[in-house]
Amino acid sequence: VAPDLVEQVYAALVKAIGSGALAPGDRVTQEQLARQFKVSRQPVLQALRLLRRDGLLCDAPGRGVLIAPLEANSLRWVYQLRGALDDLAVSLAAAQRARIDPTLIRDGRDALARSNLPDLIDADVAFHSALYQASGNPMILEAAGRHWSHIRRAMGVFLHGEHAPRIVWDEHAAIAEAVAAGEVERARQLSQTHTHRASEAMVAQLEVRHRCAHGAAAEALDRSQTEALDRSKPEALRRGPSEAA
């Protein structure tokens, strides 16, 4: 199987998981994905193995696999890692007065104006990748590359918020400006604030989702239990006192 074909399927699935098009708990099968991507099952199988290795898939009863659940602690860890990489990158980049391509900011604002979540995530990844490249240390980008699938997923949760994306690109622009001006401490402070706020908002949104999901599940369970109890009543009790009389 051509490696680029496996990588294309893998990248498409990472993007779908990151944007929420494939949500936690969704079941996917090799056959379904092969039809969707118009490829044989072999590249799909290899891509699924990579996703399982990355912790994005888990076993499912019966056929196929499930998109792994999102856990607040896991996303905190992802943002701790990204925060450390960003802090080092902006320090090195600002020391060199590196210039971040302004079209990256424009692309992000454009995706925001179109409310296009996949493009917003792509633009965010592109901006942070540019920061890592501007640092002059190729190992920063390499380290981030090992975790992009989780970082994209974390971004998907954060950028899904109603108000979160409105200030993301203002913060990115301010970071790029401080880096270009050689203001190392200001660039670091802006980057740390950006990462911390994103992490806190992301975890809060995820916890709200979990509470809503648990509430809906509990309501459904209560309803099913009530219906089961009602079915177990004697016919006279189910009809009510007036009907039974």
Report the location of each language-model feature:
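Short linear motifs at protein or domain termini
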Residues: 1-95, 203-223, 228-245
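Short helix-capping and inter-helix turn/linker motifs at the boundaries of alpha-helical repeat units
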Residues: 4, 118, 163-166
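Mobile beta-alpha loop/short-helix "lid" or hinge segments that flank ligand
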Residues: 52-58, 147-149, 164-166
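Acidic active-site catalytic centers that drive phospho-/nucleotidyl reactions
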Residues: 86, 124, 183
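Conserved amphipathic alpha-helical segments that form helical-bundle/coiled-coil interaction surfaces
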Residues: 95, 99-157, 168-178, 186-196
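C-terminal all-alpha effector/ligand-binding and dimerization domain
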Residues: 104-110, 157-245
